[in-house]
């Protein structure tokens, strides 16, 4: 039975499952417009996910062929995965921020092993042990990369321009650029009175930027063709403060559940990351590579119990925090170390 929530005012959410993922599901939002329904995100490209998406729309009396457009908060496969199939069935347009569209385009054009080569180089540079790198090389040589999600994601045909209203007949939906989780992540501010007249300025489709009970992953290793040294954590914290100033009545995130008090949740996340950075400075009293730092950080389980793929995510997050400390002048690289070590200033 599809799980559908009516948020009022012509807005619904559908729970679309993510296979083999502790997040469980993506909340795909449906926005009624004068030209037909528009989806905010689409879910993972998987038969069961597609069936739930179609079933959820059916429960609302909407055929997939009725979908007018798709607005993507960011390029990750649990958000953008089914966009191409939606477009094939309905002829809907797909809109995304240019920075994430560029990642999608480069990923589609690259040979399948490019991303694994890049990841292996990055992990070696931060001190990953050889036995961790061997499976990456084996996967590349086996050709299994051809089946990984995101390699053939649909190319968007519209650009989301920060600060501008999207062209949605009868609705006021404004794009807010919130880089950090991805370079082109956007939140979407529905500038309309809350249907229950909750105090505040409209509602916010927050994607993965602002979640009620999870701190979104802020890491590196997103784009093999990156040409600048990004500071995703710095970008994320700046973006959080902008969202906190909106004063929205309710947040409609892409995971978990809707919630009020965006400003309070923003404060919690800002405090969390400041505590995290302060804790890392204590660990960096002794020079460490980002890998060794990740081994010593607090996660939701001991390092030895963290699955292989999650370790890659963890060390990318550790390096993102180190990069923020370096940019703040609170840590520095140790000259002559290879792999590079960092120490608190």
Language model features by range: what are they?
Residues 37-38, 44-46, 148-149, 154-155, ...:
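Metallo-beta-lactamase
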